[in-house]
Amino acid sequence: MAIILGIDPGSRVTGYGVIRQVGRQLSYLGSGCIRTKVDDLPSRLKLIYAGVTEIITQFQPDFFAIEQVFMAKNADSALKLGQARGVAIVAAVNQELPVFEYAARQVKQTVVGIGSAEKSQVQHMVRTMLKLPANPQADAADALAIAITHCHVSQNAMQMSESRLNLARGRLR
């Protein structure tokens, strides 16, 4: 069993999603958004750090998964996003959590089956996969999709390791 915290970082809205993985079964534990309504960036970063720390304390995750930075057209936006990611990662590292990063395209490919999927498609698939009564908010859905991606990637890595071990022992042909 593992609890995974997924984070969709943003300097104004940071989505989070928490799921439990038992074997191949995924279950929803919680999700939402950390909204920073102050104008100055240092105060927003402080709120993101405090919010992520509070979520970690509440859910006690085993793994922390976050979206990688993509190259934005606006350099200022990309820098702010990078800073938001940074404080979220520091919150995880301060709690001794292992950090995993996934590209947005990989997340969409894993959850929807198309790397260029729309936000509404991600929301629908997250709702379906986690058996939710309604679509989660867009940023929370993205964070849940990041957590789901971590489960799939880690499950595949474990299966590959077991296959290699069995091959080395002469059990696979």
Swiss-Prot record:
Its EC number(s): 3.1.21.10
Record's cofactor remark: Binds 2 Mg(2+) ion per subunit.
Binding site for Mg(2+) 2: 67
Record's subcellular location: Cytoplasm
Leading EC class: hydrolase
UniProt subunit comment: Homodimer which binds Holliday junction (HJ) DNA. The HJ becomes 2-fold symmetrical on binding to RuvC with unstacked arms; it has a different conformation from HJ DNA in complex with RuvA. In the full resolvosome a probable DNA-RuvA(4)-RuvB(12)-RuvC(2) complex forms which resolves the HJ.
Upper taxonomic lineage: Bacteria, Pseudomonadati, Pseudomonadota, Gammaproteobacteria, Enterobacterales
Principal subcellular localization: cytoplasm
Keywords recorded for this protein, A-Z: Cytoplasm, DNA damage, DNA recombination, DNA repair, DNA-binding, Endonuclease, Hydrolase, Magnesium, Metal-binding, Nuclease
Family stated for the protein in its record: Belongs to the RuvC family.
Active site residues according to the UniProt entry: 8, 67, 139
Entry-linked PANTHER family: CROSSOVER JUNCTION ENDODEOXYRIBONUCLEASE RUVC
GO molecular function annotations of the record: crossover junction DNA endonuclease activity; DNA binding; magnesium ion binding
Highest taxon listed in the record's lineage: Bacteria
Necessary cofactors: Mg(2+)
The protein's name: Crossover junction endodeoxyribonuclease RuvC
Cited InterPro entries: RNaseH-like_sf, RNaseH_sf, X-over_junc_endoDNase_Mg_BS, X-over_junc_endoDNase_RuvC
UniProt cross-references to Pfam families, sorted A to Z: RuvC
GO biological process annotation, one example: DNA repair
Coiled-coil zones: none
Transmembrane segments: none
Ligand binding (Mg(2+) 1): 8, 139
Physiological role: The RuvA-RuvB-RuvC complex processes Holliday junction (HJ) DNA during genetic recombination and DNA repair. Endonuclease that resolves HJ intermediates. Cleaves cruciform DNA by making single-stranded nicks across the HJ at symmetrical positions within the homologous arms, yielding a 5'-phosphate and a 3'-hydroxyl group; requires a central core of homology in the junction. The consensus cleavage sequence is 5'-(A/T)TT(C/G)-3'. Cleavage occurs on the 3'-side of the TT dinucleotide at the point of strand exchange.
Reaction equations catalysed: Endonucleolytic cleavage at a junction such as a reciprocal single-stranded crossover between two homologous DNA duplexes (Holliday junction)
GO cellular component, one term: Holliday junction resolvase complex
